[in-house]
Amino acid sequence: MASSATDRIVIISDPHLLSPELVVPGTAIERADAVETKMMAHSDDIMHALTDSIIALQPACVLISGDLTHNGERLSHERMVQYLDRMARYGIQPLVIPGNHDCNNPSARRFDGDKTLPAATVTREEFAQLYSRYGYGEGFRRDPSSLSYCCEPVEGVVIIGIDSNMDELNTLTSRGDSTDTYHNGGCIKPETLQWVTRIASEANADGKRVIAMMHHHLAQHFDQEDRLFANYIVKDHNNVAQQLMQAGVHTIFTGHLHVTDAATLYNSDRTDSIVDVGTGSAICYPFAMRVAQLNDESNSLEVSTRWLTEAPECPDLREQGRQRIIAATPGLTTLLSSKVWNKVGPRMGQIKKFLEAGGNKTNLPETSQQASQLVFRHLSGVLSRTMLAVVEGNEQDLQTEDLINEGKLGIRAMIEEAAPEQADALWEFFLNDVYPKLEPVVRSILEDRNAVATDKETRADDLHLSCKL
């Protein structure tokens, strides 16, 4: 079929917009920006460039799957609405859904020279009012239990925005609570899931196609995501996915993890499936957006990926963003090391005693920080390249075996530093007992495989997809 703008949809996620009104240049914003993979200080500039790109594409609608703002600041929401209004003036229908950063956020801040100060956030009711034209006002069907809604921006195509956030559990001292607490995990309320499946079933019964979006992942984008990064995938995700499939939802756009990745989840007998199309953060390298074209002949959605390459005040946007990812390696190392240390650390005394039996000497780490430094010394290079591969998508196009072998060499060097006199025996133990458990996860990440080495294994093309409707 000949494509047209009337059946084109653009998808972006996690723009994390920080209003310029919240920033007075100085050391406060510089310090905050320096530790981010997100290009926070350039978020307004990037959103300006994205808006120009979207207007040039002239899609029927734009889906934004959450984390519209940096930390839920009211002024940032108001700034985002200005950009959406500009798109709307060109006949484009923006549609939004909140992310975990967007409502009831105790971390809302403004940056004033060398000071970081509290800023006003928004309630869920205020969010709905601000975005009344983009999901929550007249002409939209609302779920009474959440910020979920549905609409039909293209004739015969129903969009369902699903609220997967838990910010109703947040507490804010600015509102009289005793402490500030914040929840970034995902959960769909039972009554909301019931509402969503009813809407989807009705749409399918009427011969309409259904596309969903929400902030958190629905499918695991790598093996054991629900264990290693549980806050990035909705609770009870398999059951939720099965119910959505049964209701006729086969494509859902998500965000949250800031990676451009796709994963397919099947029902038990592989007769039905749902594709979770994750889109990376609009203000993180490689600055991805999705362009989806409806195909009536195949009843599918043809999804391609594009990248923003520059912004008015940041002509070297991609290189700056790439360096941010590399600079984040120490933080990733600390995160991974702490997860391992939480399990191994309490037994380190016993391990040390066992390895030093017979007079052997060891240099075992005694703290989580020392463990992190050990990992960083030997694995920083391979971790940086792996992070770049993951955020860029289509990791299988890279030299996976080279990365895996480099990682093994780094682990061997770690063992030799920590326990030089026992290195051969420990290396043998790693190869025979530890690595077989790690390998499915490693290959799942680096080869875009899910359910590795099982009868449900799938492999995705992260950047170019044909999604059935």
Residue ranges and their predicted role:
Residues 18-21, 70-72, 100-108, 167-170, ...:
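Active-site environment of divalent metal-dependent phosphoester hydrolases
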Residues 1-7, 315-469:
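Non-catalytic terminal accessory segments
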Residues 16-46, 72, 113, 168-188, ...:
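Acidic/histidine-rich helix-loop elements
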Residues 79-201, 270, 291, 301:
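Extended active-site neighborhood of metal-dependent phosphoesterases/phosphodiesterases
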Residues 54-61, 93, 158-160, 174-275, ...:
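His/acidic metal-ligating clusters that form di-metal
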Residues 6-20, 32, 156-172, 213, ...:
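Active-site-proximal beta-strand elements of phosphoester/diester hydrolases
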Residues 14, 62, 67, 80, ...:
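Divalent metal-coordination and catalytic microenvironments
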Residues 1-77:
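N-terminal active-site segment of His-dependent metallophosphoesterases
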